[in-house]
A protein has these predicted regions:
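Conserved metal-binding segment of the jelly-roll/cupin
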Residues: 102-125, 131
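Non-catalytic, conserved peripheral segments adjacent to functional cores
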Residues: 1-105, 124-127
C-alpha cells in the first residue's frame, strides 16, 4: 500500500496492492494493520455504495460534531472527479476546493478526514464506495 499526502492537510491518496492476471483484477482496499502502520483511522462505522448516472453531481456530505468521521472514497467503475471543500473554520484554505480525479482502473482511494465536504461528478455511469 502506498500512501501519498495531497495538497489539503490530512487528505491522502492510498494506492492498494493490485493483482492482475488472466482471471481479472484483485484489490484489497482495506487492511487494518497496514492502515495502522500509517497512523490512519480504522474504526469506520458505516459503508455506502452508490451508482450515479452520466453527468450527475452528488454529495456535499459532511457531519458536524459529535458525528464527524473519516471517509474513504474510491471509484469502482469508470472515472470521477471528487471535489473536496475545506469547511475547517480558521483554516487558511477555509471555503476553498480541490478537485481530485479517480479512475477505477487505478484502484486509488481518497482518505478524507473530518471537516472536509466531499462531492463528486462522473462523466460516465460510475460506482463510488464510501466507508
Amino acid at each position: 500500500m502506498i500512501v501519498e499526502p495531497l495538497n489539503l492537510p490530512g487528505v491522502l491518496r492510498i494506492t492498494p496492492k493490485i493483482v492482475r492476471d488472466v482471471r481479472g483484477v484483485f484489490i484489497k482496499p482495506f487492511v487494518d494493520v497496514e492502515y495502522r502502520e500509517h497512523n490512519l483511522q480504522t474504526n469506520f462505522a458505516e459503508e455506502y455504495y452508490s451508482i450515479s448516472f452520466q453527468n450527475v453531481l452528488r454529495g456535499m456530505h459532511f457531519q458536524t460534531p459529535p458525528f464527524e468521521c473519516y471517509k474513504l472514497v474510491s471509484c469502482l467503475y469508470g472515472f470521477i472527479r471528487d471535489v473536496l471543500l475545506d469547511i475547517r473554520v480558521g483554516s487558511p484554505r477555509y471555503k476553498m476546493c480541490e478537485i481530485i480525479e479517480l479512475d477505477a482502473k487505478d484502484g486509488e482511494i481518497l482518505y478524507i478526514p473530518p471537516r472536509y465536504c466531499p462531492w463528486f461528478f462522473g462523466d460516465k455511469q460510475i460506482g463510488n464506495l464510501l466507508l
